[in-house]
């Protein structure tokens, strides 16, 4: 976790509940192609069970400082549904578009007061691109001393190895290390 410099928050903390991988290919090509991978009507994908973080570290005040987990999967190389243009956008804004979802107004949400829209498909990410969901509770004290708690699920599409927002590839025989920095309910930073 890292407090954004423009916020007067204190005690920023994350209590991880678990993680899971979504859209793991159940098959892979025996030999690599120059572009793309096994895809089409006969291809299947699965979602792993939610697992606890393998490591978590806390400071002297018992505030979350880091955590981690490891997984292995077949390659999954996808072309974006829609390319992200870098014109006039910072790297952080380009990255945020990778996780952008379409929002559907499907009517009345009497069971969810205040909700007007339902999340739809990803706007830029391809339908079968692999992503990791990390869930937990994010909390902090705001600048008025009020404690803010939120049950959160952060989505991180794999790829982005060279900072390219249109890269959704996970290549075979490649080790990726993702460093995810939580900076708030709607704010994460990623290094690959």
Give, region by region, the residue ranges found by the protein language model.
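Acidic, serine/threonine- and proline-rich intrinsically disordered appendage/tail regions
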Residues: 161-192
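Tryptophan-paired
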Residues: 3-172
């Amino acid at each position: 976790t890292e407090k954004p410099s423009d916020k007067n928050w204190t005690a920023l903390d994350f209590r991880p509940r678990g993680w899971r991988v979504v859209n793991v290919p159940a098959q892979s090509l025996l030999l690599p192609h120059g572009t793309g991978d096994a895809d089409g009507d006969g291809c299947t994908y699965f979602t792993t069970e939610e697992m606890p973080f393998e490591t978590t570290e806390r400071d002297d005040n018992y505030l979350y400082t880091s955590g981690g987990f490891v997984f292995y999967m077949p390659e999954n190389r996808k072309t974006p549904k829609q390319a992200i243009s870098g014109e006039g956008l910072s790297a952080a804004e380009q990255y945020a578009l990778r996780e952008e979802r379409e929002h559907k107004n499907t009517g009345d949400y009497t069971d969810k007061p205040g909700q007007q829209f339902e999340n739809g498909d990803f706007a830029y990410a391809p339908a079968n691109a692999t992503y990791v969901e990390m869930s937990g509770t994010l909390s902090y004290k705001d600048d008025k001393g009020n404690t803010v708690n939120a049950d959160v699920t952060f989505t991180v599409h794999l790829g982005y190895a060279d900072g390219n927002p249109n890269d959704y590839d996970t290549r075979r025989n490649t080790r990726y290390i993702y460093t995810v920095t939580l900076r708030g309910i709607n704010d994460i930073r990623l290094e690959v």
